[in-house]
Design a protein with these regions (language model features):
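Active-site glycine-rich loops that stabilize anionic/oxyanionic intermediates
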Residues: 68, 75-79
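Alpha/beta-hydrolase active-site loop
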Residues: 126-149
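A domain-start/cap signature at the N-terminus of enzymes
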Residues: 18-70, 90-92, 97, 101-103, ...
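Active-site nucleophile loop of the alpha/beta-hydrolase fold
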Residues: 110, 183-186
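Cap/lid segment of the alpha/beta-hydrolase catalytic domain
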Residues: 107-133
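The serine-hydrolase catalytic nucleophile loop
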Residues: 81-93
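Short glycine-/acidic-enriched loop or helix-start segments at secondary-structure transitions
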Residues: 82-84, 116-117, 168
Length: 186
């Protein structure tokens, strides 16, 4: 009987030792902590050797403890992400609404293509040229933002103006598990 108590004591000690080692597993190592930036900032991301830019707005109400929805707002053909984010009017400035709606909004920059204007290419699922396919870029953008912020991946929305609306449609049709809903402004 004494042997059983000794084994039980060793087992309990081992279990508590394991728990203590792993109890902080969800906390970031201070050396690995990421900088949370609130408000409107300009960001970059590398995608297939190309530096892509986007404007990001994180509301002051952001709380890393709570999963947060993400809205991706695509500009139209010939547009500019910075100018689009700064535009005024009823259909613009999603970042103002994000304060009360408690969501993060990003305005990615399209790529200058054949026509000499920044545009979106929703591509084709069978396309092997992922440099010309903004579906892959958008997936990487979502993953990149989720590494820094606590994104609710079931609440990622796409909205777009004109060619940006076509991009939102492309995401809804070709990446339905990544996008919860879309909105088209023109």
């Amino acid at each position: 009987m004494k042997l059983n108590y000794s084994l039980l004591t060793i087992l309990i000690f081992t279990l508590f030792s394991c728990e203590n080692e792993n109890s902080d597993s969800n906390e970031l190592d201070p050396a690995e902590e990421v900088q949370i930036e609130l408000g409107k900032t300009n960001q970059t991301i590398e995608h297939n050797g190309i530096t892509r830019t986007y404007v990001q707005y994180v509301p002051n109400s952001y709380n890393h403890e709570n999963p947060t929805p993400l809205v991706i707002n695509f500009h139209g053909n010939g547009g500019d992400a910075q100018a689009y984010a700064d535009s005024t009017g009823d259909f613009y400035q999603f970042h103002n609404v994000s304060e009360s709606g408690k969501f993060i909004v990003v305005y990615p920059q399209g790529v200058i293509r054949v026509k000499g204007a920044a545009e979106w290419d929703p591509g084709d699922n069978s396309s092997t040229n992922i440099n010309d396919n903004d579906l892959f870029f958008t997936e990487k953008l979502i993953e990149n933002i989720d590494k820094t912020y606590n994104i609710d991946l079931t609440k990622v929305y796409a909205v777009g103006f004109s060619n940006g609306g076509m991009m939102a449609y492309g995401l809804a049709c070709k990446r339905p598990t990544k996008i919860a809903a879309i909105g088209i402004m023109s």
